[in-house]
Amino acid sequence: MELKLDETLQKGIEAYGNGQVPEAERLFDQILISQPYHPDANHKMGVLAFGEGRMQEALAYFKIALEADSDMGEYWLNYIDALLELDKLDDAKAIFDQARLKGAKGEAFDLIGKRLSEPNVS
């Protein structure tokens, strides 16, 4: 079963990379039907929703992905970006602090940390 899920995830990633968003969404959703808390599938669905401007939906997917696997820095960064898109600066700062406490680090986190500390962040 896990191999089939991995294959489906890879096909979804390829479809997304080829601009086939509806097919990618269908494949990721197929994974979530059998494993609703699958971190990668939730994250990818969040990325799709974010790309289409559905920020509340993206937040929900990113949150589930983080709850399932809080070690993935990309999940934290995308969650923070979605919060900023919704002008939820205080929430974004709180999530950033949580990410740092979990050990998140690197250039991308340094950049978003600077962004969060600037006046008039958006």
Can you say where each PLM-predicted feature lies in the sequence?
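Structural signature of tandem alpha-helical TPR/SEL1-like repeats
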Residues: 2-6, 16-29, 51-64, 86-100, ...
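Short, charge-rich amphipathic alpha-helical segments embedded
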Residues: 30-51
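Structural marker of alpha-solenoid helical repeat scaffolds
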Residues: 34, 68, 101-102
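TPR alpha-solenoid repeat register
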Residues: 41, 75, 108-109
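Canonical tetratricopeptide repeat
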Residues: 44, 78, 111-115
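TPR/TPR-like alpha-solenoid repeats
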Residues: 48, 82, 115-120
